[in-house]
Amino acid sequence: SEMCIRDRYGISGFGLARNLRIPRKEAQGFIDRYFQRFPGIREYMDETVKFAKENARVETLFGRVIHTPEINSKGPTAGFAKRAAINAPIQGAAADIIRRAMIRMPKAIATMPAKMLLQVHDELLFEVAEDAVGPLVEVVREVMETAAEPVLKLDVPLIVDAGQGAHWAEAH
């Protein structure tokens, strides 16, 4: 997981070695093998940066535009802009999906003794009568798992986990 997370943020062999407390050569080997094993990731990164440099923007899967005006800068600013350009379509698509689910949710739960309270990243928190938890989970799961549709038919299904508790921490 260190590799998947660090990859999006452009970690170097030096940075990975420092984080894992291993020799730099070994860390660079991890990075090289990672990109050999998952060549599509490098391709995505390269294509996204190229597009951002040519257009000063990137887009989410839903076509929402995220501007990247610093992408052609020099020095550390360019590195930050490059990492942001790579990450923005991924996090932006996740934000688009949760937003679409939130827009659909009030209608979906209108007849239930439940209220959507807040959103935190990719989670929605509800207040619900205890005897309605099961039916609410079914409705919420359906709304969230199909939130990308009909605009997108995803190749990988969205899977929703649910928890319950007297408070947010307990629900995890």
Description of each model-found segment:
Residues S1-E2, R6-H172:
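Conserved catalytic core of nucleotide polymerization and phosphodiester-bond processing enzymes
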